[in-house]
Amino acid sequence: MSRVAKNPVKLPAGVEVKFAGQQLSVKGAKGTLELNIHSSVEIVEEAGELRFAARNGDQQTRAMAGTTRALVNNMVQGVSQGFERKLQLVGVGYKAQAKGTVLNLALGFSHPVDYELPEGITAETPSQTDILIKGIDKQLVGQVAAEIRDFRPPEPYKGKGVRYADEVVRRKEAKKK
């Protein structure tokens, strides 16, 4: 059995789990998330926690049980607390402004970049150079942050660009004659 799958997922107060065939639904204070469970993974709810097991003992099913456990744990954490990712804009004239479901970015191009936020994701701009992306789906929050970063990734010589708040940009020395 996968070592990850051996640990149960504790359900905090206010989080409700429902099974409908191979469909798992997790409902909490911040919203609802759904996941299709692989047929080789068995989930049992007991005493306020979820336990995961592989139906047969081969390597792929054990790995799938661990993966499912990690995904369900992220769903439980998302509907109870939510996820957030912080981005920083570094560079002269680089600005961000959130207007509803659109994020307006000035990243040194000849045109402004308008990024349409997907459903379930919100963006805040505490300052013109900081972007805070929030949502209940961990994968979607990370995907949106990566797409925004891809507009202008940090370059190694001056460090200008869009970076994650916890990212360390490797710097290069300029060529000398």
UniProtKB/Swiss-Prot annotation:
**GO MF, one example:** structural constituent of ribosome
Q: Which PROSITE patterns match?
A: RIBOSOMAL_L6_1
Q: Could you tell me the keywords of this UniProt record?
A: Ribonucleoprotein, Ribosomal protein, RNA-binding, rRNA-binding
CC per GO annotation? cytosolic large ribosomal subunit
Q: Which domain of life is it from?
A: Bacteria
Give GO BP annotations, semicolon-separated: cytoplasmic translation
Do you know which Pfam families this protein is assigned to?
Ribosomal_L6
Q: How does it assemble?
A: Part of the 50S ribosomal subunit.
Family from the record: Belongs to the universal ribosomal protein uL6 family.
Q: Function of this protein?
A: This protein binds to the 23S rRNA, and is important in its secondary structure. It is located near the subunit interface in the base of the L7/L12 stalk, and near the tRNA binding site of the peptidyltransferase center.
The protein, known as:
Large ribosomal subunit protein uL6
Q: Name the species this protein comes from.
A: Pseudomonas fluorescens (strain SBW25)
**Gene (UniProt):** rplF
